A protein has these predicted regions:
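Alpha-helical interface subdomain recognition
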Residues: 4-158
Length: 158
């Protein structure tokens, strides 16, 4: 099951990037249209910072997914490591982006039929697949600490 998981992680990571990106787009649309205290919600400094952090996280996650896909394409021995790294990064990015969406939409973000709530739920469920975050962190830490890697049978990637 563990070996199957390393091939599923890049695909799941790509899905998480899509969820995060959709959540951010929807949040930006709402937050630029909604006026509070005379200006769009998105233009309030704290909210703008949250949107910027979500955007940066999504971009970083997308890059790690590309690295993982390239490692698999080249049949590199550390492809499993990069797949797990991609999994961790994208789960974090999806959580941040969907959480920002729920926060900035206020009460609308908690309505069960609203896209913000749906995206948050999707991101959380996806994060539980393939052993969850703890299993992924255990795999990555084994490589980073050079104590063996259950994913690749190698040490730390160069």
């Amino acid at each position: 099951a563990h070996r199957i998981g390393i091939h599923v992680k890049p695909q799941g990571a790509a899905v998480a990037v899509g969820i995060a990106h959709a959540a951010l787009d929807e949040t930006i649309e709402y937050a630029t249209d909604r006026i509070v205290f005379g200006k769009p919600v998105a233009h309030h400094q704290g909210n703008a910072f949250d949107l910027a952090a979500a955007a940066a996280g999504i971009h970083g996650a997308r890059l790690v997914v590309r690295d993982a896909a390239a490692a698999f394409d080249r049949d590199e021995p550390d492809a499993g490591f990069w797949a797990t790294q991609a999994w961790l990064e994208t789960m974090d990015a999806a959580f941040v982006a969907t959480n920002v969406g729920i926060q900035l939409l206020g009460g609308h973000g908690f309505i069960a039929d609203h896209l913000a709530e749906k995206r948050f739920r999707e991101a959380r469920m996806l994060a539980l697949a393939v052993g969850g975050r703890d299993a992924a962190e255990l795999d990555v830490s084994a490589v980073v600490l050079d104590i063996g890697d259950p994913l690749t049978a190698g040490g730390r990637p160069s």
